């Protein structure tokens, strides 16, 4: 019975997918399509809260394509504008860097913006989550939950994959060294 309820809950959750970019994730509860957000360049899709929790407006979640893969080099705080801070998010076993910023909207209301880049194998994407400043803590939790549900292959190697490749490379170098030594010993014996 518990498995049936779990399966039903999963079916009721809305999934965002892109076969072209190779990802799938569960949309936060209460978020619905926001086609106006796709008007910006390279936006794949956007969603907003159907019923905003805050009286100051709805939160918006968007996916933007990056037209390339993401390297592992870290951003430096000194390269960021003064109003932007580095934050971190978890995806699979990777620590992703993100940006947090507060901005003034029309009418003087403050809004937060959270951005993180996801190193998908086919093409990296950026996830944006923005909303009223009074919802920032909730927004951070929603972006973390979204990343936790995001499925897709990464172009980054996990620590296990890196160790495996290092072990394979070391094995080849050892095999080459043994072969060279064997040839030298064989030549010496023939010359003697």
Predicted regions and their residues:
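Signature of long, low-cysteine stretches enriched in small and polar/charged residues
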Residues: 29, 36-37, 74-120, 177-180
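Surface-exposed amphipathic alpha-helical segments
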Residues: 22, 28-33, 122-166
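Secretory pathway targeting signatures of secreted, lumenal, and periplasmic proteins
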Residues: 19-74
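Short, surface-exposed beta-strand/loop "edge" segments at domain boundaries and coil↔beta transitions
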Residues: 51-59, 67-73, 107-112, 124-125, ...
